[in-house]
């Protein structure tokens, strides 16, 4: 659903300013919503704020290996480095 072209234009592109950005299903939906979703969202918020304050960015290094499965769209291997800008 997160890559449904009828819901998200350019679904494979990260566009955080989308009007419907919060309509993703990353943490499930309804009674199947992940119990740790709010904690994960808070942790990501703090991480991004701290990286912004320290003027840091994440750089992808090397080849990206994706996990292909019915219920998971993630990464098997994703090498990164942190740098300042």
Where are these predicted regions, by residue range?
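Divalent-cation-assisted or electrostatically stabilized phosphate/pyrophosphate-binding catalytic cores
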Residues: 26
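A residue-level signal for conserved active-site and pocket-lining positions in enzyme catalytic cores
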Residues: 14, 44, 80
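Conserved cytochrome P450 K-helix/beta-meander segment immediately N-terminal to the heme-binding cysteine loop
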Residues: 1-21
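Catalytic-pocket segment enriched in acidic/His residues
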Residues: 34, 38
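Cytochrome P450 heme-binding "Cys pocket" and the immediately downstream C-terminal segment
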Residues: 39-67
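C-terminal domain-closing interface element
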Residues: 76-85
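Short Gly/Pro-enriched turn/cap motifs at secondary-structure boundaries
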Residues: 69-72
């Amino acid at each position: 659903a997160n890559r449904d072209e009828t819901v998200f234009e350019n679904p494979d592109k990260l566009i955080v300013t989308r009007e419907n950005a919060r309509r993703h299903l990353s943490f499930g939906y309804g009674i199947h919503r992940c119990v740790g979703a709010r904690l994960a969202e808070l942790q990501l918020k703090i991480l991004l704020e701290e990286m912004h304050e320290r003027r840091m960015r994440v750089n992808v290094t090397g080849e990206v290996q994706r996990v292909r499965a019915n219920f998971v769209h993630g990464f098997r291997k994703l090498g990164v480095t942190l740098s300042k800008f």
